[in-house]
Amino acid sequence: MKHAEIPPPPDAAAEVFGPALGAARRYAEILAGAGVERGLLGPREVDRIWDRHILNCAVIGELVEAGERVADVGSGAGLPGIPLALARPDVHVVLIEPLLRRSDFLREAIEDVGIECSVVRGRAEDRSVREEVGPTDVVVSRAVASLDKLAKWSSPLLRPGGRMLAIKGERAAEEIEEHRRALAALGVSELKVERCGARFVDPPATVVVGFQATAPEKRPRSGRRQR
């Protein structure tokens, strides 16, 4: 198959990725090559591979703290997890993907690009996946499902006080109102919309942020004396 020509990275990419720019360029080549061949990226997306896909995902690093453990649910072609790992080598990213052909692609991609990510094959809601991944500080996702489903998958992976970051579109605020009650039932609250990367991508990435409730404080039963 003849691969589409990949546009050069915009100037912003050098600032976002720093010394990892070469690795980001290699990832763009993989997406435009094997990613298109395996049906993980549409061929028409190659022309906007930087702004719409790679940079759009990388800039959510603005919402992640150094040293945090991040899980990417339904990672697919590695978006947003791989660009985030490239832009933020100070965090550890786990890519979660249920389909074998996609998880194989992810393993091949991270080895080729040369970044330290983990790949876990399975569904985020599966107990075995939760046990393998362990408690995480942040769960990220992009174009995977509605907010209520994302919260159902993300919540069990998050430590108390952890955050769900979902890259969404123009309806982000409407989705929050539509699913607020369902998210609250799962312990996800303090919902808000953040815009990331205004200096690097136009339009900025739209991210729904939700916080996992902390464990309720245990109090002695009324009438019982503490010892």
Swiss-Prot record:
GO terms for molecular function: rRNA (guanine-N7-)-methyltransferase activity. Belongs to the methyltransferase superfamily. RNA methyltransferase RsmG family. It is found in: Cytoplasm. S-adenosyl-L-methionine binds at G74, L79, A124, E125, R142. It is an enzyme of class 2 (transferase). CDD domains: AdoMet_MTases (cd02440). GO terms for cellular component: cytosol. InterPro entries: rRNA_ssu_MeTfrase_G (IPR003682), SAM-dependent_MTases_sf (IPR029063). The keyword S-adenosyl-L-methionine applies. It comes from Mycolicibacterium gilvum (strain PYR-GCK). Its EC number is 2.1.1.-. It comes from the Bacteria. The keyword S-adenosyl-L-methionine applies. The gene is rsmG. Keywords: Cytoplasm, Methyltransferase, rRNA processing, S-adenosyl-L-methionine, Transferase. This is Ribosomal RNA small subunit methyltransferase G. It holds the Pfam family GidB. Its main location: cytoplasm. SUPFAM superfamilies: S-adenosyl-L-methionine-dependent methyltransferases. Specifically methylates the N7 position of guanine in position 518 of 16S rRNA.
